[in-house]
Structure formats: structure tokens, C-alpha cells
């Protein structure tokens, strides 16, 4: 069984190492990467990400809604393409299935 919380933690570590400016779009901006797991805002975001992954796996994810919310935060296709690459690395590291289709669904609404 996949530990999606661990996948998500590795995803965000990978994403913020590759694109540190992305962390500024979150409520935990300026928090050291090594301290993220102890930050309440990060825990909330990571939990939402795990919930979305579970919904995507179950076929009930609201890709249009997620895309719409992110557009309002000036997050577009470039960021999601970069996130897709980081998510693929995190999934691979944990033996998890590739979730590229979930990102593609979001991208189709941007």
C-alpha cells in the first residue's frame, strides 16, 4: 500500500528545491524545507493534496475546480507542468503509480 503522505512530502520537497519561488504562493512561504512537516499551513496543504490524489485515483477529482482556484492565484500551466515532473519523481521513489493523468486533467482546464 502506498503511503501518499510520504509521496506528497517528497513531492513538495522536490518542487520547492527545483522551483523555490513556488513556495511564496503558499501560507508557509519562508519556512525552511526541513521544517515544513512541523508547519500547520503546510500540514493543511499536504492533507488537501493527499485528499485530491485519493479523489483522482477514485475517479471523483474536481480538476476543473482545482484549476479555477489555482488560476485565481496566478498559477498556470507552466507551474503544473513542473509539478507533474516533480510528482512523477516522488511517485517513482515510493513505488506509487504515476499520477500524470491527474495533472493532465487539471491542465486541460487551464
UniProtKB/Swiss-Prot annotation:
SUPFAM superfamilies: Globin-like. Belongs to the globin family. Signal peptide: none annotated. Keywords: Heme, Iron, Metal-binding, Oxygen transport, Transport. It comes from Cerebratulus lacteus (Milky ribbon worm). The lineage of its organism: Eukaryota, Metazoa, Spiralia, Lophotrochozoa, Nemertea. This is Neural hemoglobin. GO terms for molecular function: heme binding; metal ion binding; oxygen binding; oxygen carrier activity. Residues 2-110 form the Globin domain.
Amino acid at each position: 500500500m502506498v503511503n501518499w503522505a510520504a509521496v506528497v512530502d517528497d513531492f513538495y520537497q522536490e518542487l520547492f528545491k527545483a522551483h523555490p519561488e513556488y513556495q511564496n504562493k503558499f501560507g508557509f512561504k519562508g519556512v525552511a524545507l526541513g521544517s515544513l512537516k512541523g508547519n500547520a499551513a503546510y500540514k493543511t496543504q499536504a492533507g488537501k493534496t493527499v485528499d485530491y490524489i485519493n479523489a483522482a485515483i477514485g475517479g471523483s477529482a474536481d480538476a476543473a475546480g482545482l484549476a479555477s482556484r489555482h488560476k485565481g492565484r496566478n498559477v498556470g500551466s507552466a507551474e503544473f507542468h513542473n509539478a507533474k515532473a516533480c510528482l512523477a519523481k516522488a511517485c517513482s521513489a515510493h513505488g506509487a503509480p504515476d499520477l500524470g493523468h491527474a495533472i493532465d486533467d487539471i491542465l486541460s482546464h487551464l
